[in-house]
Amino acid sequence: MAFGALGGRGSRRSRRSVSARVAFGALGGVLAALVVPSAAAAHGIQLVTDLPIPEWLFAWATAIVLVVSFVALATLWPAPRLDPPHDRAWRHYPPWLDPLCGAIGIALFVLIVYAGIAGAQLVTANITPTWIYVVFWVGLAVASVLFGDAFRPFNPWRAIARATAWLVSRMRRGAPAPEPLPYPAWLGRWPAALGILCFAWLELVDNPAQRVEPRLLAFLALGYAAVQLVAMSLYGIETWTERGDAFAVYFGLFALMAPLRWADGGIHRRAPFVGAVALEVMPGTIALIAVMIGSTSFDGLSNGTVWISLFPHLFSLFTSLGVSSPDAATEYSYTLGLVGMVAIVGGMYRLGTLGMRSIGAGYEAGDLARRFAHTLLPISIAYVVAHYFSLLAFSGQSMIYLVSDPLGTGANIFGTANFQPNLAIVTGNVVWYVQVGALIVGHVGGLMLAHDRALTLYRRARDATRSQYWMLTVMVAFTSLGLWILSSTQ
């Protein structure tokens, strides 16, 4: 998106003065938030051991990029441009595509559940764990940001509910169906936030051997689907899908940032990130985003040197409180770490909005938190890419042989059962560059959205810029947190 044209020669001196004030204010925010480590190692399978430039230079370079971006936005983006978001119709898709995708989603769900129950219980031989933790959890998040809501058309429980509703309507021969219950406004997206937190607990806290057990994952998938179907029957299919279905809401939030929007039988194009402006903030939305960022952060933290030092103290705390089982004390410690990291993320954002309130204009901190919640979405996908890129690049290759032998029974359906993943497909340096690049792009995107929203809320551009000193501090703090976690990972 092009910046607005600059003014005439007479305004250059004032702009230089404004730029200087903005730069000094931004520098103050950076110095307040920047805490960077001296060691760097990529999260995932390979460690970074031979970076081409010093690690501290990476960290300061990212902070400088954020400051330069902030100054550029303050001087070259004087009026709001993104609210409301604009898109253009691009292509139409046939009406049969949606039910076809739904049928594919149901078939895949049946395959994953059947493989988990009836297949080999070895994690590397059964398709279920890799599909859930790599393709579904990570791959679909990235696909949603690139191509739009990739999960919605394939959502198996939504497809089952819609097919059931269609059959019931045919059986009733035109008789009106019972109206769904009104969805409680106070409930908002809290069910989705709780669902994502529970999945993160399964992935990061539960017993390592148990969390990847194919049969357990299959039964959990069946249980989750049953809950969704019951909730859809009570509150309506689309209402629950947009508010309560944890994974539908999770991927839907990522899809807001995609350059493509699928709606009304057509594909619409827009600039990346700008769709986040349309985020409908309801109860539980900010908590959900905090869970998204905090759980990803804890995944990296729990593999790092800081957690290795902290964990024994937490373990001793719970044993001193009467927890006799070592496994239980371990789970309690990790649970506290997970919840604590989510609270830290939420607290950092809350501090930023409390600081913005000092600018005046009559906005309360809670109102500002809701109005700027969409600015956290680019950070959430930045953390996903930074922490899971190596997982997707290396473990994702396992799908090549698993599709030929999904149950681990020795089959070779597509002739790829003997494929060996290439662990040298990307180097450690490439992993590091992708991770740092994702953090920079995500936080610059968040700054852009925050700056545009500030221009919408504050009458004077100067007040809008001053309010964003606090948001810049938050963004740099999130960047520093991400780099610190990556660098401390073992």
Located regions from the model:
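N-terminal secretory/membrane targeting signals
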Residues: 1-42
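Transmembrane-helix bundle segments that line or gate the permeation/cavity pathway
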Residues: 44-270, 284, 298-303
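Hydrophobic alpha-helical membrane-insertion segments
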Residues: 140-145, 283-300, 375-399, 475-479
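Long, internal scaffold/assembly segments composed of regular secondary structure
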Residues: 233, 241-354
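Transmembrane alpha-helix/helix-exit interface in multi-pass inner-membrane proteins
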Residues: 296-306, 344-355, 379-413
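Hydrophobic alpha-helical transmembrane segments and adjacent short intramembrane/lumenal linkers
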Residues: 376-384, 394-396, 400-441, 450-451
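Interfacial loop-to-transmembrane junctions
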Residues: 449-475
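Juxtamembrane boundary at the C-terminal end of a transmembrane helix
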Residues: 482-490
